[in-house]
Amino acid sequence: MKNLFIKGVLLSCLVSIIASCTDMKKSSSVVIDKDQIKKEIQERENQFAKLLNADEVKKIGYYADDAVTFYQNMKPLRSKEDRLEFFKDDLSSNTNKISFTTIEVFPSNDGIQVVEVGYYTVVDSTNTAIYTGHYMSLFEKRDGQYVCLRDMSASDME
């Protein structure tokens, strides 16, 4: 009798564990459309380039307020004001145009955060590439739109 009771308790525990694991698996399966995320990120990059090229830096909504940008050979830009000042200084002295190409995206399991690997090209007034390089950006979806939290770049030019 005692042996039968122990077997019953063990069987109940085993069934409970299996049932709870099965329920967790069902509830945590979120379908991530990597191609759609890549398209959304590329749209953000296109909008960012368009505003930079038009010298409309105050309209740039690409970055989150708490974003940090790591450019080469300078201290990280940690505030919106620092970033705006950098763009103003950079854009005021040239007529170059920049474009960004999303190469790969690596979304989190829930699609809220995305790491992007991309390529940038800066061309002069004759449409000749004068700077090229790669970048990595970390995006987070806030209020239904991806915003950049961290980014860094590396030039291909010597």
Task: Go through each PLM region and give its residues.
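Hydrophobic/aromatic beta-strand elements that line small-molecule binding cavities or substrate pockets
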Residues: R83, F87, T101-F106, G118-V122, ...
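Bacterial Sec-dependent N-terminal signal peptides
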Residues: M1-I32
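Solvent-exposed loop/turn segments at secondary-structure junctions
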Residues: M74-P76, T121-V122, A154-D156
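A solvent-exposed, acidic/Ser-Thr-rich amphipathic alpha-helical stretch
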Residues: D35, E56-I112, A129
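Short beta-strand edge/turn micro-motifs at domain boundaries
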Residues: T22-K26, T132-M157
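Short, low-complexity N-terminal intrinsically disordered segments enriched in polar/charged residues
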Residues: C21-Y62
